[in-house]
C-alpha cells in the first residue's frame, strides 16, 4: 500500500518545537504522494501479505511511538539496527528526547502538571470520554471491530483507508510502520500499525505460507516457537479481549486477502514512552514509584489473564493523558495454562532478558519470572537512566547478565528499600526471585503502607482467549472465484463441482465404501443382450469410430463421433443418450 508521509527529512523533524508541537499535524509539510499514481495498476493477489492495526486515540500531547519499536536494545540502551543496509531513521513528532521530568515538573501524582510541557499533536480536538484512560476495567469494553474489506483511496496529500485518513508516519519498526490516522466517524486520532506480510515471512526465513495460526503447547507444557505471522494473530487475539487502564486498547483490525498489508488500529497514547534509555535525566524516586505502581497493576492483570508479556521495557510503557502508564507491544507475548507458563524459546530485548532464558543448560523456564526480571531492569532504568548490564557485544552482554553481580552507581543516591526491591527482582535464580504478590506489598512500593495497591479482585477481571478466537482473530472476505463458484452451484441446484462434466452415477445405499458407485449403463440398452443381437441393431452407415463398438466415447480427452444413419428395418427405435455417459477404453 502506498502512503503519504511528510517530505521533511527524519533528522530535521525533531528540531522545530512549534511546527508539530503546537500546530498539530502540518499539512503544508506534506506533498502529494507520488506512489499513489500507481494504485490503479496494482495487481490483485489472493494471498495476504500485510497487516494493519489501529488503536484508540487520546487527544492531547505526544505520540505513541513504541507501537512500532520492536527493535532490540544494545547493552548501553541504544536500539540495535535491524538492517545495516537500511538507514537509521525514526520519525518523531516530538523534538528530541524528553525525559519524564521535563514533561512533569509538578510531581507524578498530578495529571494536569504532566500535561503542561507535553507535545500537543491535535490541540484543536475536543476531549473524548471514550478515549479517556481513566475508564474502569469493570466498565464494559467496546468490542473490537473486524473489517472484512479494505477500501483504499488516494487523495492529494494522504491516503483514505475506509473511514481512516492516514497522515504522518509517527513510528517505524522491523515489520512495518505506525501512522497517525484520523477517524472521520468519531472525530478521533488513532495510531495505525501497518504490517507487511511479505516482509514478516521473508525476514523469518519462511519460503511459503507458515502453518496454521496460533500457539500450541508442546509435550511437557512448554510453548513452541511461533513464526511472525502467528505472533501477529496471537497479539490480535490477546488484545481484543484485554480491557484495563494500564494496557493499550486495540480498536479495529483491517485485513483484505487482496491487499498486501494488515492494518491494526490502536488508541493513540499521546505522550509516548515513559522515558528514553539511556538518559542523563532519570526519574526521581517518587516519579519512579508512581509509574512502577501502574506497571505492577498492568502485569498483575496480564498474569491473571494467563498472559506473559516477555518484552517489558521503558519504550513499551506509554504515558496517557492522565499521566498513567499503559503497557503496549504484545508481539512476543505468550499465553499459558495452569499457574505459570513453561517457556523454551528466547525472545525479547537482549538487555532485558533474564539469565535463565540465556542459559545453555536450562531448557524450560518460568514465564512469570521473566516478566519480573524485566520489571526489575525497567525500575533500574527509571532511577539510574541506564540498564544494569551493558555491553556492545551481544555474547558479552549475555555473559554479564548470567554471571556479573548487580552493582548500584554512587549517584543518584537511592533508598535502601529501593535497592532491596531491585536486588530481589534481579535475582539470577528464578526460584528465589520475588513474585508479583510480594512486590505489591514491598515497603518501597507502598511507601511503608501509606499507598497500598488494590487487591487482585479489585484490579483484575478474568477474560479468556480461546484457541478458536486465535484462529479467527482476523476474518477475511471470500475471493471472487469462491463467490462465483457458490452462485453457480446454487443456480444449478447442485453442490457438486459445477466445472466437472455432469456425469451421472447411481448409488447403492447399502454398499459400503468404494462399492457405493455402480457402473452406469445406457438407458436404451438391455442389461443382458447377446452380442449378435446388438450387432443386428447396428444402424447402416460408415463405421469410422476407432474406439470400437457403437456410440460415442472419450479417447485421450476428445469425443469419438460416429455418423448415424437411419435405423435398420425391424429394429427397435433407438434413443440416443443426451451426453456421454461412460468413457470407453481405447483398443
Curated annotation (Swiss-Prot):
Region described as Calmodulin-binding: 474-499
Entry-annotated residues carrying N-acetylserine: 2
Q: Where is the composition biased (Polar residues)?
A: 1-11, 101-115
Q: What CDD domains would the database entry show?
A: STKc_CaMKK2
Residue spans of biased composition, Pro residues class? 569-579
Substrates-to-products reaction catalysed: L-seryl-[protein] + ATP = O-phospho-L-seryl-[protein] + ADP + H(+); L-threonyl-[protein] + ATP = O-phospho-L-threonyl-[protein] + ADP + H(+)
Q: What activity regulation does UniProt give?
A: Activated by Ca(2+)/calmodulin. Binding of calmodulin may relieve intrasteric autoinhibition. Autophosphorylation does not alter activity or regulation by Ca(2+)/calmodulin. In part, activity is independent on Ca(2+)/calmodulin.
Major localization class: nucleus
Q: Where in the cell is it found?
A: Nucleus; Cytoplasm; Cell projection, Neuron projection
Assembly and partners are described as: Interacts with calmodulin.
- What does the UniProt entry state concerning the protein's domains? The autoinhibitory domain overlaps with the calmodulin binding region and may be involved in intrasteric autoinhibition.
Under what name is this protein listed?
Calcium/calmodulin-dependent protein kinase kinase 2
Q: From which organism does this entry originate?
A: Rattus norvegicus (Rat)
**The organism's taxonomic lineage, starting at the top:** Eukaryota, Metazoa, Chordata, Craniata, Vertebrata
